[in-house]
């Protein structure tokens, strides 16, 4: 696999972004309900800075950054691309985008199994989000990235 290219997503990619999310093994079983009916729309991609990681035209991952208030809303890496450092590259890119937009802190409400990843990336845990049934029946870690200034 070559070095993935990280580029701004286009609204035309919204279907592929949705498919990548729904194919994630991290959201099967008990966690499947959170994605039930969830669609990344063309309007979402137009409104929020959304970036894809691709290699040879293959979508390997993406993230979306909300600006007001600042939050890493979505971060997914295809199952086959996990463990290769792509998640770290996407987080680094997101922090660069946040800095370029004058954002100093980025909130993350994490999928519970992803908590160790975010801590390794430098996020600090700030709290716990309670369950919100019926879609979210579990507590979720809340974290924050302090955006480097340099």
Could you say what each language-model-derived stretch is?
Residues 82:
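Glycine-rich ATP-binding loop(s) of histidine-kinase-like ATPases
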Residues 1-12, 147-150:
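Conserved N-terminal entry element of GNAT/NAT acetyltransferase domains
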Residues 98-111:
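Conserved GNAT acetyl-CoA-binding A-motif
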Residues 107-109, 124-143:
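Conserved catalytic-core motifs of GNAT/GCN5-like acyltransferases
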Residues 85:
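Glycine-rich phosphate-binding loop
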Residues 118:
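Conserved active-site tyrosine of GNAT-family acetyltransferases
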Residues 11-74, 78-79, 91-92, 97:
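Acetyl-CoA-dependent GNAT
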